Regions:
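Helical element adjacent to the flavin cofactor pocket in flavoenzyme catalytic cores
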Residues: 2-38, 42-58
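General beta-strand structural signal in soluble alpha/beta enzymes
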Residues: 26-28, 61, 127, 166-168, ...
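Active-site catalytic microenvironments for nucleophilic, acid-base chemistry
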Residues: 18-22, 69, 73, 211, ...
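Hydrophobic (often cysteine-bearing) scaffold residues that line and stabilize catalytic clefts
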Residues: 8, 69, 205
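Flavin-dependent oxidoreductases
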Residues: 35-128, 132-143, 152, 158-161, ...
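C-terminal catalytic lobe of FAD-dependent flavoproteins
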Residues: 14, 112, 121-122, 133-255
Length: 255
C-alpha cells in the first residue's frame, strides 16, 4: 500500500481555475434561501437567493455542513441531518518538517481516523485533528481543550513532537451524517446530492467528481464538451527556481 500528500487548498484553487477556464461562473457570498421545481417538476429548479432567483436544469448539492438544508428543501419527506464536526490542528514551522517523513495515523475510532502527524507539501509539520461535534456550523475557532487533546493524542504515536515550533493553529468542520456514509445520488429529477463527505473525501474527490458528472450526464442527456481544456497552468514558485531561472524571469518582466 502507498500513500501521498497534497495541498488541499492548492488543489481546490487549481480545480476552480480550470472550471472557470471552461466556462464556469462563480457567485460568491450568495446564500440560497429556497428552491422549488419549475413547471410542476421535471423541468428544472428555481433557486431563490439573497441576490435574486436563478433557474437551472440541475442542482448539485455540495454545500458541506449546509447540505442538509438544501436536501430538505428538495426532499422534505426524507430529511437529512448534518452535524458539524470540528477538527483542531497545529501547524509547525519548516524546521519541524522532517520530524516524520510520512503520514503517521492512529487506529481509527467511532469519530474517525484520529489525530495524525504528517509532513506537508510546503515542508511544514501538521498535527491533528480532533473530532468534536458542535451545534454552530460556523464554529471554526480553536479551543484550549481541543488543542490540549491534539497535544496528548499525537504523542501516543510520535514522540517528542516540537510543538514549541507551532506557527499557527486552526480548525475546520467536517460534514457528519449519523449513518457514516457519503450520500451521492439523484434524489429528485435534476437534484443530485453530494453530501456528508467526510474522510477520505479529499482522496475520493476525483472519483466523486466523475461519478456526479455521470449522474448529471444521464439525467440531462448530455454529451462531453468537445472543446473542454483539461489543463491548468500552475502558479510559479520563485523559491523553487535556481538563480539563472530567477534572473530570466526578471529579464522577462523587469517591472
Amino acid at each position: 500500500p502507498t500513500g501521498g500528500i497534497v495541498c488541499p487548498f492548492g488543489l481546490t484553487f487549481a480545480l476552480a481555475e480550470n472550471a472557470a477556464k471552461n466556462g464556469v461562473q462563480f457567485r460568491f457570498d450568495t446564500k440560497v434561501t429556497g428552491l422549488h421545481p419549475l413547471d410542476g417538476g421535471g423541468a428544472g429548479w428555481a433557486v431563490e437567493t439573497d441576490h435574486g432567483t436563478l433557474e437551472t436544469r440541475c442542482i448539485v448539492n455540495a454545500a458541506g455542513v449546509y447540505a442538509d438544508t438544501l436536501h430538505n428543501m428538495a426532499d422534505a419527506a426524507h430529511p437529512m441531518t448534518i452535524t458539524a464536526r470540528r477538527g483542531d490542528y497545529f501547524l509547525l514551522d519548516h524546521t519541524a518538517g522532517q520530524h516524520v517523513r510520512h503520514t503517521v495515523f492512529q487506529l481509527p475510532g467511532k469519530y474517525g481516523k484520529g489525530v495524525l502527524v504528517t509532513p506537508t507539501v510546503h515542508g511544514n509539520l501538521l498535527v491533528g485533528p480532533t473530532a468534536i461535534d458542535v451545534d454552530d456550523k460556523e464554529a471554526t475557532a480553536t479551543t484550549a481543550a481541543g488543542l490540549d487533546e491534539v497535544r496528548e493524542k499525537s504523542g501516543l504515536a510520535v514522540k517528542d513532537i516540537p510543538l514549541r515550533q507551532t506557527i499557527t493553529s486552526f480548525a475546520g468542520l467536517r460534514a457528519h451524517e449519523a449513518r457514516h456514509d457519503f450520500f451521492i445520488g439523484e434524489i429528485a429529477p435534476g437534484f443530485v446530492d453530494c453530501a456528508a463527505i467526510e474522510s477520505p473525501g479529499l482522496s475520493s474527490a476525483p472519483a466523486i467528481g466523475a461519478m456526479v458528472a455521470d449522474i448529471v450526464r444521464g439525467s440531462l442527456h448530455l454529451h462531453n464538451k468537445p472543446d473542454f481544456d483539461p489543463t491548468r497552468r500552475g502558479i510559479l514558485d520563485p523559491k523553487a527556481l535556481d538563480l539563472a531561472a530567477r534572473a530570466e524571469l526578471i529579464r522577462q518582466n523587469p517591472a
